Amino acid sequence: MRLTDFEIEQALDAGTILIEPRPSNDAISGVSVDVRLGNQFRVFQDHTAPFIDLSGPSAEVQAALDRVMSDKIDIKDGNAFFLHPGELALAVTLESVTLPADIVGWLDGRSSLARLGLMVHVTAHRIDPGWQGKIVLEFYNSGKLPLALRPGMTIGALNFERLSGPVSRPYNKRKNAKYKDQQEAVASRISQDS
């Protein structure tokens, strides 16, 4: 069952769900908690690789990713990151989230932003039980105009579901968890797939 606003507040008070910094009461609505945009971004550099063979040898995949991904870009509070039409960028939430082994989270974009062409997550919107860290956002501008994204703006909402019991393989205990304790806009680690 999806948690209600009252249940979310109870989970935050009890420390069952941790969100740092803790959201204000205004950020909690019927079944969700607003999350804000952090200061870190990464983009794809133009024309630095003809393609990436996603099923190729791990070393080749990683070398191609290293060529196409920018270094971390830090945007100061009050300044804007501009996402142009047809561009993909990675960013990170301001908040760090920790979930127990019996709760799964879901990230949803904001309808007001989607109506301008902004996708907040291209596909990956599940936050696994046992997750600990910031959430990487996969921005895509499918609109016609550049979009100015500013750190601290409300960028999406998290909602939570309590499972019938704790999972036996929570994310923070998995040896092969590629994004464990993520605190910045981490690029794809697909080369670590086995």
UniProtKB/Swiss-Prot annotation:
EC numbers for this chain: 3.5.4.13
Pfam families: DCD (PF22769)
Biochemical pathway: Pyrimidine metabolism; dUMP biosynthesis; dUMP from dCTP (dUTP route): step 1/2
InterPro entries assigned: dCTP_deaminase, dUTPase-like_sf, dUTPase_trimeric
Active site: 138 (proton donor/acceptor)
Keywords noted in UniProt: Hydrolase, Nucleotide metabolism, Nucleotide-binding
Function: Catalyzes the deamination of dCTP to dUTP.
Protein's name in the database: dCTP deaminase
Annotated source species: Shewanella amazonensis (strain ATCC BAA-1098 / SB2B)
Gene transcribed to yield this protein: dcd
